[in-house]
Design a protein with these regions (language model features):
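Conserved beta-strand hairpin/beta-sheet module of binuclear metal-dependent hydrolase folds
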Residues: 1-51, 156-167
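Well-ordered beta-strand scaffold positions
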Residues: 10, 27, 88, 133, ...
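Hydrophobic "anchor" residues on beta-strands that sit immediately upstream
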Residues: 29, 58, 82, 164, ...
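Short catalytic-loop micro-motif centered on adjacent basic/acidic residues
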Residues: 30-33, 57-60, 146
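Metallo-beta-lactamase
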Residues: 36-38, 134, 141-234
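Active-site HxH/HxHxD metal-binding segment of metal-dependent hydrolases
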Residues: 38-135
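C-terminal regulatory/interaction regions
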Residues: 236-280
Length: 280
């Protein structure tokens, strides 16, 4: 595990979820998306210790535990760290049991709770809710940008080095080619956010999930691939609904026609995205 420099004071640490690190002049740091709880946060902290970096702030781009789950472990290690998120996604971070209810579409069950719930997620508290716009931390300015779609409260962080951390607005090309029926809450907002990203001035983009840092030029190609994936499923679902179908039959067709991997958890994620498409 390494601290990889993107530009200036902006770094990231690769992982299943990439973690952004912005280092201030006093060698304290802002962490963007600490990732899942477990062994990885301990390794991240070891890397930071080796570089004499003390974490002072955490910003979570959205309320999914693969991005915010390690907050408590960072809080235990760095006692005075300030944990932040959007106001909307604060609800899900502080009440992780709501996510399984949302995914199931009603009262959840023990099986789903056991898949999604982790004891290390208990009692995460958001110290400060943040809004879109200029945002000052430790005498330096950041841009907080709303990118709704994946969740209602998704945000991105743009550093003064012109590096943007977009959470799950985009995923890496290597992942998108395998899993193109993405987990989305609001299709129209996702389209709006993808178009919005095209007009933002940045030099480098760090994905929540993906192996490479993306240049501004390459981001256009990746944005179009995401838009095309959306169009693909919108077209398929419209075609399938020429004749009335139940939600279950429609979902079965989508899974089978696209050879989507399917287990209990993925089934409910696909169903949630399908409902979002139908709403759109």
């Amino acid at each position: 595990m390494n601290l990889t420099k993107v530009k200036g004071n902006t770094f990231f640490i690769k992982g299943g979820t990439n973690t952004g690190i912005y280092v201030f002049e006093d060698n304290t740091a802002l962490v963007i998306d600490p990732g899942l709880c477990g062994s990885r946060p301990r390794r991240v902290n070891k890397v930071l210790d080796e570089n004499n970096i003390q974490v002072r702030y955490i910003i979570n781009t959205h309320g999914h535990d693969d991005h915010y789950g390690a907050c408590n472990q960072f809080k235990e290690y760095y006692k005075d760290v300030c944990i932040m998120s959007s106001e909307y996604d604060k609800l899900y971070i502080e009440n992780p049991e709501l996510f399984s209810k949302y995914i199931v579409g009603g009262k959840s069950n023990v099986f789903m709770d056991n898949i999604l719930k982790n004891k290390m997620l208990d009692d995460i508290k958001i110290d400060k809710s943040i809004e879109a716009g200029k945002f000052e931390l430790n005498n330096e300015m950041f841009d907080i940008i709303e990118f709704q779609g994946h969740t209602p409260g998704s945000i991105a962080v743009l550093t003064k080095d012109n590096v943007i951390f977009v959470g799950d607005l985009l995923i890496g090309d290597e992942i998108l080619s395998k899993y193109d029926f993405l987990f989305l809450y609001d299709i129209q907002e996702q389209i709006n956010s993808l178009e919005k990203l095209k007009n933002i001035d940045f030099e480098y983009l760090v994905l929540g999930h993906g192996k490479q840092v993306i240049s501004k030029e390459d981001s256009y190609k990746l944005i179009e691939k995401h838009l095309n994936a959306l169009k693909k499923y919108l077209y398929q679902i419209r075609e399938l609904l020429v004749e009335p179908k139940s939600l279950e039959i429609l979902l079965k067709n989508i899974i089978n026609n696209n050879n989507l991997s399917n287990n209990y958890k993925e089934y409910h994620f696909f169903k949630s995205s399908l409902v979002s498409v139908i709403s759109y």
